[in-house]
């Protein structure tokens, strides 16, 4: 990796889906050997997947690594209904396919579904789209800090989806009362919430 960096093949060394201990170990190895240091981390982060606030993001702050949040709408979970989740799904949410099995293992859990119902109720009462609420919350009410190089990875299959996401983000912060209700959802879901896409619940045993 260091040779590729010195050859000008990339500008920043990034990590993704690492545990905090792994980030520290890799950083220390790079430091000791004068290798290029990681300066950006891409990690799961949404209103219902916030475990990284407790350890990973603080570690990134200490090491000078910016944090780019992927799945700000939790892989599409936050735009679904509880009824739809219980029925299964189509596309990447089809439980008969590998990706669908993964997504259901991450999100189709009792506390997550309870939080999803709360999410829908808040959106309906506030007159907001569920995706809009997620994008605006993560942008303006989370621990992400643009001054530290943090950002959001917006997944879109069509240009129109990206444009729509950017438009709702430009609306600015949510009403403080709405943001507080969203904060409260975390207390509902945190025991069932996944840590990242590939380690899911397994990280509990590694902490």
Residue ranges of each PLM-predicted region?
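Conserved, mostly hydrophobic/aromatic
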Residues: 13, 41, 60, 67-70, ...
């Amino acid at each position: 990796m260091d040779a590729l960096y010195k050859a000008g093949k990339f500008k920043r060394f990034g990590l993704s889906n690492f545990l905090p201990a792994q980030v520290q170990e890799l950083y220390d190895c790079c430091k000791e050997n004068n290798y290029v240091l990681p300066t950006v981390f891409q990690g799961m982060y949404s209103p219902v997947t916030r475990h990284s606030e407790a350890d990973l993001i603080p570690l990134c702050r200490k090491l000078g690594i910016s944090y780019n949040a992927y799945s700000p709408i939790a892989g599409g979970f936050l735009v679904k209904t509880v009824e739809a989740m219980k029925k299964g799904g189509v596309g990447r949410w089809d439980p008969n396919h590998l990706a669908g099995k993964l997504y259901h293992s991450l999100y189709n859990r009792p506390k997550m579904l309870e939080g999803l119902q709360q999410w829908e109720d808040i959106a309906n009462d506030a007159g907001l789209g569920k995706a809009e609420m997620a994008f605006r919350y993560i942008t303006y009410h989370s621990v992400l800090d643009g001054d530290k190089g943090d950002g959001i990875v917006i997944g879109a299959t069509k240009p129109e989806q990206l444009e729509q996401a950017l438009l709702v983000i430009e609306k600015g912060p949510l009403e403080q009362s709405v943001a507080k209700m969203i904060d409260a959802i975390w207390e509902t879901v945190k025991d069932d919430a996944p840590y990242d896409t590939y380690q899911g619940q397994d990280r509990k045993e590694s902490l």
